[in-house]
Every structure is written in C-alpha cells, then in structure tokens.
Curated annotation (Swiss-Prot):
The keyword Endoplasmic reticulum applies. Its main location: endoplasmic reticulum. Residues 88-98, 149-183 are lumenal. InterPro entries: TMEM85/Emc4. One of its GO terms (cellular component) is EMC complex. It comes from the Eukaryota. This is ER membrane protein complex subunit 4. Residues 2-66, 121-127 are cytoplasmic. Belongs to the EMC4 family. The chain crosses the membrane at residues 67-87, 99-120, 128-148. The modification N-acetylthreonine is found at residue 2.
Amino acid sequence: MTTQGGLVANRGRRFKWAIELSGPGGGSRGRSDRGSGQGDSLYPVGYLDKQVPDTSVQETDRILVEKRCWDIALGPLKQIPMNLFIMYMAGNTISIFPTMMVCMMAWRPIQALMAISATFKMLESSSQKFLQGLVYLIGNLMGLALAVYKCQSMGLLPTHASDWLAFIEPPERMEFSGGGLLL
C-alpha cells in the first residue's frame, strides 16, 4: 500500500508540467464555455476571442527613444576610459605617434562641439533633453581637457618661464667689472 501511494505521489510530481485540458477546472476553455455552442473543440492556451488594445507599443517606443537619447548623451563619457588608455600607451615623448594621438583626442571633442546643434535636434524628442544635452557637453569638455593635459605633460604647451625667454628683455647690467690687474 505504501508503494502504491508512493507511485501515485511520484506520478503527480513527475507530470507537474502537464496542463489539464479537459474538465471544468482545466487550464483551457472550450468553445462551449465561451458561448459559441460548437462542442468541445479547444482553443490554444492563451487564446482570446476579444481584440486586445495595443497600448504597450507606444510605451515601448517612448522607452526606446529615451534609451537612444541617453546613449547619444553618454557617448563622449564612454570614450574617456579608452582615451586614458591611449594616453598611457602613447607615452610622453614627442614623436609622430603620440602627437597624432593627441591631435585626434583633441579633434573629436572639438568636432562634436561644433555639431552640437545637430545632436540637440536628435534629443528634442526626449523628455529629459536638457539633462542629456548637459551630459553630452560635459563629456566632450572632459575629452578636450584630457587632450590639453596630455599636451601639457608632453611639454607642448608653453607653461614654464623658459618657454617665454624670447619675449623677455635681457636684464641691464648695473656694474661692470674688469680683470684682476691694476694700472
């Protein structure tokens, strides 16, 4: 008796995934339950006779537009880690490769800032366009600041007094001294 009870309990657990399609407590309803009176033929699970209003499409489109606008706004900030890696790999020596890297690091943010009005037109459909535009602007300014810092660390910016010696007048001598002989 215990073995039969165990088998019945085991059988119930074993077919837990099965859907009971017949009977009044079943998972699916027949056409007779819907009032069509055509017998016991079954509809597929999840089928409805009524048309479901499609309001989720508009909400999904709005969410996708917001997500796309944030992707555009965060684009310059996503480039900063790669720029830091390129700065590290280029070194501080003045040669053609590091100079080209610095020029490209400076040119991309400048180009993006010159085309900022076209970018803001793409962000107009967003409800957070001001914040997204501000994030975009800050990201490009940070990229430009990294390029200026790299120029300074390479010694390309005139930040020391010795860089301006050509513009400084030589000091006037207050005294003249001669050799060690008296005449």
